[in-house]
């Protein structure tokens, strides 16, 4: 019985180990599949590749700059003439010859420059006309490049034109106020600005002068009363005459 129990235990242990090995193998296969899905360019490899590309681009740029500088120096050496030491030359004929040579060289270079500029302008005009034709065939419209103009430029131009011509009368736009109205406004302001004590004195003087002004008004009443009998007498005389 003990031998059978030992064999069962060994068999179970072997089965357990076999299952563990199978599970481990499955996990390894799954990990390998995930790694294979990521591809060759991992993030680390991408960083390294980017650095290498940047270094190579910088080296190429430096090489191109050196080549351009060498070509420039070579072109300048071919085009320029080595100038002689004029200070050490005393012969007038030799100096005139140097002057004539330099002048001829200058005129030649100016002619070449003019020819090159003419060719460039012609080619640019042809390119523009061809691009316009192509855009017309495609049905596209090329917007012209508009020049930005400041709003103050027009004002300055107008002011300059006005100064050059007739002078502007800025008072023409002002509101016209009559002289009488202005004097009335000034008088009202002066009256309002007077102190209170002057107003009190004026009120007292007005009260004193009020009775004196009433007294003379009684005389016309008496005169009217005297005039009424005279009118009646005249009417009576007219009746008698009739």
Swiss-Prot record:
Region of interest: Disordered: 1-41, 190-242
Ranges of Acidic residues composition bias in the record: 220-242
Tissue-by-tissue expression: Expressed in body-wall musculature, with weak expression in late-stage embryos and strong expression during the larval and adult stages. Also expressed in vulval and anal muscles, and weakly expressed in pharyngeal muscle.
Record-linked Pfam families: Troponin
Keywords, comma-separated and alphabetical: Actin-binding, Muscle protein
Any one Gene Ontology cellular component term annotated for this protein: sarcomere
Effect of inactivating the gene: Worms exhibit abnormal locomotion, unregulated contraction of the sarcomeres due to small portions of each myofibril shortening irregularly and independently from another causing rigid paralysis. This is due to poorly defined sarcomeric structure, with small islands of thin filaments interspersed within the overlap region of A bands and the H zone.
Low complexity compositional bias, start-end: 210-219
Superkingdom as given in the UniProt entry: Eukaryota
Record's signal peptide: none
Molecular-function GO term, any one: actin binding
Biased composition (Basic and acidic residues): 8-32, 190-208
Function: Troponin I is the inhibitory subunit of troponin, the thin filament regulatory complex which confers calcium-sensitivity to muscle actomyosin ATPase activity.
Full protein name: Troponin I 2
Organism: Caenorhabditis elegans
């Amino acid at each position: 019985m003990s031998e059978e129990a030992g064999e069962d235990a060994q068999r179970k242990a072997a089965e357990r180990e076999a299952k563990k090995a199978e599970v481990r193998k499955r996990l390894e296969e799954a990990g390998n599949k995930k790694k294979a899905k990521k591809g060759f360019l991992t993030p680390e490899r991408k960083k390294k590749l980017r650095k290498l590309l940047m270094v190579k681009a910088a080296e190429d740029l430096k090489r191109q700059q050196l080549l351009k500088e060498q070509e420039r120096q070579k072109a300048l050496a071919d085009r320029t003439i080595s100038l002689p030491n004029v200070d050490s030359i005393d012969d007038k004929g030799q100096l005139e010859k140097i002057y004539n040579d330099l002048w001829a060289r200058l005129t030649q270079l100016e002619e070449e420059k003019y020819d090159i500029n003419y060719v460039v302008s012609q080619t640019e005009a042809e390119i523009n006309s061809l691009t316009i034709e192509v855009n017309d065939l495609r049905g596209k419209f090329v917007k012209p490049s508009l020049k930005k103009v400041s709003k103050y430029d027009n004002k300055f131009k107008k002011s300059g034109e006005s100064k050059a011509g007739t002078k502007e009368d800025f008072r023409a736009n002002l509101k016209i106020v009559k002289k009488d109205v202005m004097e009335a406004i000034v008088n009202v302001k002066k009256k309002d600005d007077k102190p209170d004590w002057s107003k009190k004195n004026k009120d007292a003087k007005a009260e004193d002068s009020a009775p004196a002004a009433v007294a003379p008004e009684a005389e016309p009443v008496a005169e009217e009363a005297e005039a009424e009998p005279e009118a009646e007498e005249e009417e009576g005389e007219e009746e008698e005459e009739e």
